[in-house]
């Protein structure tokens, strides 16, 4: 798996300053003993479970490599060589100690002054010297045996099916890597790789089938049998889709699986002859009948003897019931009852009958169509979980249908307003002998050009396809160096290019109007020549910019992003701003942590404090990852880059290997701890809506401060002492000032890009949405796109919060406004607006968590295919009718139609409403227990604008790609 596709790809960038900024955090105050001993019996069990397992797995990405704690074991044995260490039974004898007692709740809540005096007298906040958790911790590395047992019990661990080799009389299975396109050396030999059988993947679709089978084995255990309809058993041998003759070949020879994947399919039919460039925009002018909406099925590509073509088998149990009277064919499928009972239909990729195109360039969905029935055309829309998987299937289908990529392509450099033409040296273009074209000079391509120098007029389309794919087997750095080498030849650009390449990291991206999509992996780079031949995007060379971590105010002053803080506080007001409840003073002990402009509230017994994490790792003094501030004993600063060798450079070869390994292990553990806090957070406070933060002076205690919101609501908090109160006030004030300006600049960037493109095209604002969706890329080649909106942090996953903003979720026939936060592996929703039974909007202080949607094994699609999700009545406005613009509270106006704002998430995990009990163990509490037979759900959303919809869809798709990788 490519390291750039994992959740820790941000560790491999070259900017040491950016790495230090991402990993720097501050913990304020000691750990209050009564926060833990309020439920000492449960916390004992919970903390053992948490510290022994929580750092060893990722909640969102189970495919990430586990953390090696060998250096911790080595450290513990070196310090105490004579003392045996029992890692499986951590020391928790002080957890249930009765020395630190807590006053009765009835005594604490008699009155405001009495509550605070008793609170201080009984030691509500214990110092670190008297706190057993400050001196020792239960965080211990686990053994390999315990890790394997917990991996089986964990509900988050992803299980993979064992690979099953495909047997054939003319070919033998090999143990080589999986091949996308088979290479035929002779007529009787075909190299394939052992793949997972379709039955093993069908077990995930149909949980009732508990056994797996070999496809070509004649005598196997059949397992659960699916009943077939009598119409299919008694029907005669039908015509194969896409071929005008009966199927007479022997499927024993045609059982060679080239590729198989679980896809999302939509099946339609029409009587109209489709154009060769049929796509999402052309579908509006074609009358179609939907045979089956978007549903999950297994797509299998097999080699056949019919015209030496490839056959696509669609397999699904649920779709068979819908398509039984339409397109189900009783073909001589492989001899397996489970395969036959779920078999739908086949499409033979014949160049004379079948056609293909990229249906939606935004979500990389593709469309296949072929003759079907009498004067009918069968349309199959395919949506994939990842862009790389989509490119692989496009490569297979395009090669089978004799689609040959172009031997050259144009690359735009927006910084210099020039275009470069790159030509593949494995071809000799006889039609254009005198051209000033630029050649990519790499060792691989040069060797390929010496062995095969062909003419375009004599080469076959499939050979051209294979040679172009081989020509792109180069790294991104080699490709960028080739482009820069061309620019440096010109004396006019040589000095500028050298300065530009030193100050920025350059990369390749696709551009379509104002949208950018980075090519950030070697696997995606090999399909550039194939996608460029479709003329859907513009390939560009741009600098890779991260999300800005500084702002500039109107007076010219600059401010860096404040360091996020976390710690324990007591909230003395309810969500409605009241200080009393049922005649008693409101009192809630919580753990607060700042991420971006949010102050998240977490239950104290559900989180591992930052100070305990580093002390439990027991690192030596040479690596001061977390230490007390010299001027303030209540401040713990977590800074892994606090080493002199890491000030100038990042994690490169100049650093010692042991130090580099310790860095990576600690940063991964800290990222997983942050992700766990966001997963279990109950609510958050939006600090960008804070008006003022000031201490409360009219009380006897000096450790209380008040936050005033822009809507007039007030929140009261109590800290450990006066010093910690001042620290919280300063940090919250800095975060509020910074993120108010940062969010304003982000919105201004959206507005500037749209206004610039409107002025370039000389169009009205109401026409701009149609231009963005339906014009070709050469018609909008002069428009601009922003790398600050589509920054490189979204590709690497530098920040744990990938996206945030307002979405409108479809609930029955209405849309519910909610606030969404995208984190690795899931999309979390918080309640945005509450109303009374009379419809009056209620004011609130913070956002409560509602539910979350798992992005594991999910799909996302956009465009006109989402219009079927709308439940419209006869009086509802139709999407093609013009309407007044939508106006939002921040001043943004949107003329976009519903189909330009909508996107649908097809999730097999369903919704987690966070119904776990408060006192529960993390192994079994995270997520609602789901039935194995639960149906997948579709969730439809509307964004505020088309620009925000594009960003939401791209980043959600990237998270789905990481989970699929």
Curated annotation (Swiss-Prot):
Instruction: Please name the Pfam families in this protein's record.
Output: PH_4, PH_SPO71
Checking InterPro entries in the record gives: Mug56/Spo71, Mug56/Spo71_PH, PH_domain
Give me the ranges of the annotated region Disordered. 70-175
Residue ranges, compositional bias (Low complexity): 102-114, 159-175
UniProt record, GO biological process: ascospore-type prospore membrane formation; protein localization to prospore membrane
Listed GO cellular component terms? cytosol; nucleus; prospore membrane
Domain annotation PH: ranges: 562-737, 800-961
Ranges of compositional bias, category Polar residues: 82-101, 124-158
Q: Which UniProt keywords apply?
A: Cytoplasm, Meiosis, Membrane, Nucleus, Repeat
Q: Identify the PROSITE patterns for this entry.
A: PH_DOMAIN
Q: Which GO terms describe its molecular function?
A: lipid binding
Q: What is the membrane topology listed in the Swiss-Prot or TrEMBL record?
A: Peripheral membrane protein
Q: Taxonomically, which superkingdom?
A: Eukaryota
Q: Where in the cell is it found?
A: Cytoplasm; Nucleus; Prospore membrane
What family name appears in the similarity comment? Belongs to the SPO71 family.
This chain's function reads:
May recruit a lipid transfer protein to the forespore membrane during sporulation, thereby aiding forespore membrane formation. Required for meiosis.
Q: What is this protein called?
A: Forespore membrane adapter protein MUG56
Species name for this entry? Schizosaccharomyces pombe (strain 972 / ATCC 24843) (Fission yeast)
Q: What taxonomic classification does the UniProt entry list for its organism?
A: Eukaryota, Fungi, Dikarya, Ascomycota, Taphrinomycotina
């Amino acid at each position: 798996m490519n390291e750039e596709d994992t959740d820790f790809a941000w560790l491999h960038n070259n900017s040491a300053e950016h790495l230090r900024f991402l990993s720097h955090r501050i913990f304020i105050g000691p750990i209050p003993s009564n926060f833990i001993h309020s439920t000492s019996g449960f916390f004992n069990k919970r903390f053992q479970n948490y510290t022994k397992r929580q750092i060893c797995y990722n909640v969102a990405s189970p495919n990430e490599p586990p953390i090696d704690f060998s250096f911790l074991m080595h450290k513990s044995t070196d310090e105490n060589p004579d003392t045996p260490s029992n890692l499986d039974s951590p020391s928790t004898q002080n957890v249930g100690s009765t020395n630190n007692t807590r006053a009765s709740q009835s005594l604490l809540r008699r009155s405001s002054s009495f509550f605070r005096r008793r609170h201080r007298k009984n030691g509500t906040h214990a110092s670190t010297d008297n706190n057993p958790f400050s001196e020792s911790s239960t965080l211990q590395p686990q053994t390999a045996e315990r890790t394997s047992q917990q991996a089986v019990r964990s509900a988050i661990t992803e299980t993979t099916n064992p690979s099953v080799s495909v047997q054939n009389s003319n070919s033998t299975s090999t143990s080589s890597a999986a091949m996308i396109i088979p290479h035929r050396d002779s007529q009787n030999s075909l190299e394939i790789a052992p793949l997972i059988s379709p039955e093993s993947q069908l077990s995930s679709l149909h949980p009732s089938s508990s056994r797996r089978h070999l496809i070509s084995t004649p005598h196997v255990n059949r397992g659960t049998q699916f009943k077939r309809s009598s119409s299919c058993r008694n029907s005669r041998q039908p015509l194969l889709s896409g071929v005008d003759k009966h199927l007479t070949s022997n499927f024993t020879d045609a059982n060679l699986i080239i590729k198989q994947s679980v896809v999302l399919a939509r099946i339609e039919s029409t009587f109209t002859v489709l154009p060769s460039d049929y796509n999402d925009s052309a579908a509006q002018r074609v009358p179609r009948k939907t045979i089956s909406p978007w549903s999950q099925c297994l797509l299998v590509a097999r080699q056949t003897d019919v015209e030496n073509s490839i056959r696509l088998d669609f397999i699904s149990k649920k779709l068979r019931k819908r398509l039984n009277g339409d397109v189900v064919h009783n073909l001589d499928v492989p001899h397996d009852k489970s395969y036959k009972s779920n078999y739908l239909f086949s499409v033979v990729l014949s160049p004379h009958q079948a056609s293909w195109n990229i249906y939606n360039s935004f979500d990389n969905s593709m469309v296949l169509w072929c003759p079907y029935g009498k004067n009918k055309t069968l349309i199959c829309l395919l949506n994939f979980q990842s862009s790389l998987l989509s490119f692989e299937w496009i490569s297979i289908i395009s090669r089978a249908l004799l689609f040959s990529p172009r031997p050259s392509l144009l690359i735009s450099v927006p910084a210099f307003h020039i275009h470069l033409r790159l030509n593949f040296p494995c071809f000799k273009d006889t039609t254009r002998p005198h051209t000033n074209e630029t050649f990519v000079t790499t060792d691989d391509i040069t060797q390929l050009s010496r062995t095969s120098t062909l003419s375009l007029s004599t080469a076959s389309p499939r050979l051209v396809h294979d040679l172009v794919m081989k020509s792109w087997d180069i790294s991104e750095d080699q490709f960028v160096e080739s482009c820069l080498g061309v620019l440096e030849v010109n004396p006019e650009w040589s000095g500028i290019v050298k300065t530009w390449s030193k100050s920025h990291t350059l990369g390749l991206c696709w551009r379509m109007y104002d949208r950018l999509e980075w090519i950030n992996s070697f696997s995606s780079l090999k399909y550039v020549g194939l996608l460029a031949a479709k003329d859907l995007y513009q390939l560009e060379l741009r600098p890779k910019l991260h999300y800005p971590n500084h702002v500039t105010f109107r007076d010219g002053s600059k401010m860096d992003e404040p360091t996020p803080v976390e710690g324990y506080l007591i909230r003395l007001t309810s969500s409605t701003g009241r200080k009393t409840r049922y005649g008693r003073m409101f009192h809630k002990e919580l753990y607060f942590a700042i991420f971006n402009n949010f102050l998240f509230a977490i239950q104290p017994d559900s989180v591992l404090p930052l100070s305990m994490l580093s002390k439990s790792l027991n690192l030596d003094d040479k690596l001061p990852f977390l230490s007390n501030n010299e001027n303030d004993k209540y401040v713990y600063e977590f800074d892994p880059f606090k080493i002199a060798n890491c000030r100038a450079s990042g994690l490169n070869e100049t650093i010692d290997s042991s130090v580099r390994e310790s860095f990576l292990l600690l940063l991964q553990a800290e990222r997983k701890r942050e992700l766990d806090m966001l997963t279990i957070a109950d609510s958050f406070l939006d600090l960008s809506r804070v008006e003022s933060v000031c201490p409360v002076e009219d009380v006897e205690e000096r450790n209380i401060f008040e936050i005033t919101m822009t809507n007039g609501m007030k929140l009261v908090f109590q800290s450990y002492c006066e010093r910690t109160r001042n620290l919280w006030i300063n940090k919250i004030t800095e975060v509020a000032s910074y993120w108010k300006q940062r969010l304003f600049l982000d919105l201004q960037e959206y507005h500037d890009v749209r206004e610039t493109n409107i002025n370039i095209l000389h169009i009205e604002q109401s026409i701009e949405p149609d231009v963005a969706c339906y014009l070709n890329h050469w018609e909008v080649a002069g428009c601009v796109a922003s790398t600050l909106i589509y920054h490189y942090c979204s590709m690497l996953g530098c920040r744990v919060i990938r996206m945030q903003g307002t979405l409108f979720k479809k609930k029955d026939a209405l849309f519910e406004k909610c606030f969404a936060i995208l984190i690795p592996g899931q999309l979390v929703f918080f309640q945005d607006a509450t109303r009374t039974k009379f419809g009056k909007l209620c004011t609130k202080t913070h956002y409560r968590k509602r539910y979350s949607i798992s992005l594991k094994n999910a799909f996302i699609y956009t465009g006109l295919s989402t219009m079927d999700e709308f439940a419209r009545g006869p009086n509802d406005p139709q999407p093609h009718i013009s309407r007044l613009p939508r106006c939002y509270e921040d001043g943004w106006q949107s003329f976009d139609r519903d189909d330009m704002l909508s996107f649908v998430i097809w999730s097999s995990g369903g919704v987690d409403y966070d119904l776990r009990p408060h006192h529960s163990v993390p192994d079994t509490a995270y997520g609602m227990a789901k039935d194995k037979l639960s149906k997948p759900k579709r969730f439809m959303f509307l964004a505020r604008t088309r620009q925000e919809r594009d960003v939401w869809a791209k980043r959600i798709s990237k998270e789905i790609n990481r989970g699929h990788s």
